């Protein structure tokens, strides 16, 4: 989303474990970006080697200096998030989003897609993110209260559109990793193709309903997302909506509203994921789960 929007370059996204087995079409004019917190992830490393073998340049986004992936890449963007002890990634994921935004911004500038004024505006928005994250973190007591009300649920559904859909996937992953609750991330626009059948009065549905009023596409997706919330409510689902501050339209139709500071559309995911991480944390604690060392999982997956 970020690179296509800011640099107007076509982008494909794939799992490292799937990439090498589909015989990808690559060449010297293709850049393969590999993302790994540890830099030792077996599937990602194998995907990088496959890309290099086919003549593609590789760029690593990694947290660990000197790791295998960084040594084999043509270039590296280090996230410098510091050691991440818990198995479930939190700050590393957030810093990866930031690194991808900076990469997209750089590509947009060098390709002449972004003018100087737009670039400066986006940089200023990025510089505001730490303070806005502090605001999100200050709402932690609310996330704890939400967890108290929801920790007995057996299933969760996370919905998002556009750039917010990957955050729905990540939010669902965090919850299932550390609380052992079945959770599914889904494109909000696909609800009629299956997920609607799951909705009842016992299903919490987390909906990413933020918006950037300055972006026409954001406003359109927002209106469609509000419609999705109304669909869930019509089926008696429990809606937890993540909304931007000052927005009462989505908040009014939801059961619970998590407010985050306003930002430009492509930076909203960085602010959205933190409440979902904290909600997963508090639910896991309520359920008596080991948040740092979830069962059957390892921090660095070094075997296929």
How does the language model describe each region?
Residues 1-304:
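A SIS-like phosphosugar-recognition module
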């Amino acid at each position: 989303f970020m690179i296509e929007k800011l640099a107007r370059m076509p982008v494909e996204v794939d799992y490292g474990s799937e990439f090498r087995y589909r015989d990808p079409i690559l060449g010297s004019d293709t850049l393969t970006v590999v993302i790994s917190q540890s830099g030792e992830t077996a599937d990602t490393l194998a995907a990088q080697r496959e890309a290099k073998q086919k003549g593609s340049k590789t760029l690593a986004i990694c947290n660990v200096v000197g790791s295998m992936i960084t040594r084999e890449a043509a270039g590296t963007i280090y996230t410098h998030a510091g050691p991440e002890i818990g198995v479930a990634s939190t700050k590393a994921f957030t810093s990866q989003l930031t690194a991808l935004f900076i990469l997209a911004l750089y590509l947009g500038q060098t390709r002449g897609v972004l003018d100087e004024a737009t670039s400066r505006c986006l940089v200023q928005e990025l510089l505001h993110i730490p303070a806005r994250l502090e605001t999100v973190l200050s709402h932690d007591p609310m996330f704890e209260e939400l967890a108290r009300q929801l920790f007995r649920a057996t299933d969760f559904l996370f919905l998002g559109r556009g750039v917010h859909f990957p955050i729905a996937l990540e939010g669902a992953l965090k919850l299932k990793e550390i609380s052992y609750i079945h959770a599914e991330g889904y494109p909000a626009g696909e609800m009629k193709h299956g997920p609607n059948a799951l909705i009842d009065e016992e299903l919490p549905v987390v909906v990413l309903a933020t918006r950037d009023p300055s972006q026409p596409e954001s406003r359109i997706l927002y209106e469609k997302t509000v419609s999705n919330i109304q669909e869930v409510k019509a089926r008696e689902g429990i809606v937890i909506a993540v909304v931007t501050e000052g927005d009462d339209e989505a908040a009014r139709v939801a059961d619970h509203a998590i407010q985050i500071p306003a930002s430009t559309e492509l930076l909203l995911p960085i602010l959205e994921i933190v409440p979902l991480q904290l909600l997963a944390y508090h639910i896991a604690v309520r359920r008596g789960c080991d948040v740092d060392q979830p069962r059957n999982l390892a921090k660095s997956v070094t075997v296929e």
